[in-house]
Structures are given as C-alpha cells and as structure tokens.
C-alpha cells in the first residue's frame, strides 16, 4: 500500500490530504480545506498577494490536522505531492516548497502535479470510475477544455476556450448583476426562480481562418457582452431588472453549449464514455443536462463527486498515486512552479532535468 501526503495551493484554497492506494483502489484517509472565499469576496475576486499569505498561515495547520485525523505519522508516508502548475505563482510556491522540504527532510519522493491532471483524477475518488479511453470536459474558473484520455493515460486536448473560461464568465456576469463572488454559486441560487428561456443569449463560436468554425472550441466573451447589453437596454427603458430571468437564461445557455460540444466531440471521436470535472461541474443544471444527454445518446457519463469539483488536495493525491502506480515517477527536487504549462506536457514534470 502506498500513502501520499498531497498539498494544493494553486489559487485561493489551501488544502492538504492523505490518500492511499491498495490493490488499485484509491482511498481518502483525511482531507482538509481552508477556504479564502469570504476574504477575496470583499475585493470581487482573488487577490494573489493575500492568497499566498493565507497559504503560508494555513498549510502547517492543515497538514497537522490530516495526520491527527488519520492517526498516521510522517514516517508512514511514501511520498509528498503538490500542485506546481498552472496557477498563481506565489501561491504555488508555498505548496511546492513545503512539499519539497518535507520530502527532502524525510528522504521520500516528491511529485509535482499538474493542477488539471488533479481535476481529471478526481473521478478516481468515487466508487465507480471509467477506464480509458474517455473524453473529459474540464470546466472551471480558469479552464474550459475537452481532453481525450487514451488507454495509456496520455492526454490530447481536442477543444478549449479562446477567451473567458466558463467559470470566469459566471464571475463576470454575476458582477454585472450585482451578485457576490464567486459568481457560479450566486447565479445558480437565483437562477432557480428564473425563466431559462426568457432571454435568448448567443452561443459563441470560434471562427477558423479559412472559414467555418472550430467544432469543439468555446468562446464566452461575446455571451458576457450580450448579457451586459441586455441589462443596459432594460435599464434605459426604466424597467425593473429581472435578475432571476437573466441569471437563469445565462446559466442555461452556458450549460447547453458545454453539453452540445462535449457530446459532438465524443461522438465524432468514437468515444462512448464522457467525464465531467472541475469547479463548474458542481453546477446542478449542467449536471442534469449532461445526464439527460448521455441517456439520449447511450453514452456512459461520470460526474466528479460534488465535494471534489472545486480545488482540493485529495484529487492531487489521486493524481500522484496514479503516477506512482503506472511507473516509478518522481519529480526533481529542483522542479519549480509555473503559472502556465500545457497538460499534454505534464510528463516532463518527472524528468531528471525539470522544465522550470
């Protein structure tokens, strides 16, 4: 049995977890998260300097807590893992330096994990999970991507957003409506009492230079502009702003676009298994529409467990265990952090000569 201490500090969630792998089954032994949402809400978004300071304060206590809850000690750990990319550089450094220090001190391997690989691995924390190949819709505050996972667990990006990620669009539209941060939960809450068909907002497409559109790509900046113009139009007519209807219509069109392009991609690629992960995967309307579409098309669907949709260290531990079980992967102690790094190049995080 392998046991990993995993850390996540890529943005505004400080997290630590202890995860084990026995006979191919991943078990969560302890999982702790310290959220900074309330503090960043005062600023309408994440303030990088505040985020990194809070990670410094929170992480030692979270590590202490997971060991106390699991009744394990550091001598029981086989490796330490931390998110090293992508994310806020200052925040990533806190987790990375902590993990490398512990690994060096106790002479155990260190694994630098790609944050998106962590999200992809969140499905292995559920009782039932698919076997590759499958298509993943990864949708969060910073990313909206369609990723094919092949039988060797190699990644191929087939679709992406060319501007705002879906979660970012939720935050921006929430701000236009005067709602709190983060925008996803705020919009979902008031959308429940709105009419999702009241306003017909556009489905953004990305044009090819030679004509036509990229079939699996996304664009949400035009949708945000359409919502802004609708709000301005209503206000210019001195009418009461139907916030619930606007929120519901916006939420519906985002979910519809994500569902339509995901299933088109899966069917075109001959994949009969689809996976939904990431922070926006917690959206109830999106989950319901994904399940309904999967039933229509006889495609197997796996939704990330609700508690592991947003950033957490358990998914980072799951990703690290998969790396350890597939080959004897470990990262160089010289591996740093990077605000951006393509998922397709995540294998390079385990090279003797680190990429950054």
From Swiss-Prot:
* InterPro entries recorded: ATPase_NBD, Gcp-like_dom, KAE1/TsaD, Peptidase_M22_CS, TsaD
User: What general EC class does the enzyme of this chain belong to?
Assistant: transferase
Which PROSITE patterns does the annotation name? GLYCOPROTEASE
CDD domains, alphabetically?
Answer: ASKHA_NBD_TsaD_bac
Q: Name one GO biological process term.
A: tRNA threonylcarbamoyladenosine modification
Location comes to: Cytoplasm
Q: Which family does it belong to?
A: Belongs to the KAE1 / TsaD family.
Q: Which UniProt keywords apply?
A: Acyltransferase, Cytoplasm, Iron, Metal-binding, Transferase, tRNA processing
Details of cofactor binding: Binds 1 Fe(2+) ion per subunit.
Annotated substrate binding sites: 138-142, 171, 184, 283
| Chain residues that bind Fe cation | 115, 119, 311
Query: This chain belongs to which protein, by name?
Result: tRNA N6-adenosine threonylcarbamoyltransferase
Origin organism of this chain?
Answer: Prochlorococcus marinus (strain NATL2A)
Coiled-coil-forming residues are none
Tell me which GO cellular component terms the UniProt record holds. Answer: cytoplasm
GO MF terms, alphabetically ordered: iron ion binding; N(6)-L-threonylcarbamoyladenine synthase activity
Q: What is its main location?
A: cytoplasm
């Amino acid at each position: 049995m392998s046991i990993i201490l995993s850390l996540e500090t890529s943005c505004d969630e400080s997290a630590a977890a202890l995860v084990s792998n026995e006979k191919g089954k991943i078990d969560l032994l302890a999982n702790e998260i310290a959220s900074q949402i309330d503090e960043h809400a005062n600023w309408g978004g994440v303030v990088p300097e505040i985020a990194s300071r809070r990670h410094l304060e929170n992480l030692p206590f979270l590590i202490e807590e997971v060991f106390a809850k699991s009744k394990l000690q550091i001598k029981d750990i086989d490796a330490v893992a931390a998110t090293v990319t992508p994310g806020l550089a200052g925040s990533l450094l806190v987790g990375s330096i902590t993990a490398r220090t512990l690994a060096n001190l106790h002479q155990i391997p260190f694994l630098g994990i790609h944050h998106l690989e962590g999200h992809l691995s969140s499905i292995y924390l559920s009782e039932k999970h698919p076997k590759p190949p499958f298509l993943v819709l990864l949708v969060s505050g910073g990313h909206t991507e369609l990723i094919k996972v092949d039988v060797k667990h190699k990644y191929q990006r087939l679709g992406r957003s060319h501007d705002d990620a879906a979660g970012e669009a939720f935050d921006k539209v929430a701000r236009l409506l005067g709602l709190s941060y983060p925008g996803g939960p705020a919009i979902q809450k008031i959308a429940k009492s709105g009419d999702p068909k009241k306003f017909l907002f556009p489905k953004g497409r990305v044009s090819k230079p030679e004509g036509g559109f990229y079939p699996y790509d996304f664009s949400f900046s035009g949708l945000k502009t359409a919502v802004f113009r609708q709000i301005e139009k209503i206000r210019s007519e001195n009418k009461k702003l139907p916030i619930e209807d606007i929120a519901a219509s916006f939420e519906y069109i985002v979910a519809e676009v994500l569902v339509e392009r995901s299933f088109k991609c899966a069917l075109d690629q001959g994949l009969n298994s689809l996976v939904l992960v990431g922070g926006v995967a917690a959206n109830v309307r999106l989950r319901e529409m994904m399940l309904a579409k999967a039933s229509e098309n006889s495609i197997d669907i796996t939704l990330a467990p609700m508690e592991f949709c947003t950033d957490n260290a358990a998914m980072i531990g799951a990703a690290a265990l998969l790396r350890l079980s597939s080959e004897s992967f470990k990262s160089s102690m010289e591996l740093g952090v990077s605000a951006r790094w393509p998922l397709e190049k995540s294998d390079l995080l385990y090279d003797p000569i680190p990429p950054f």
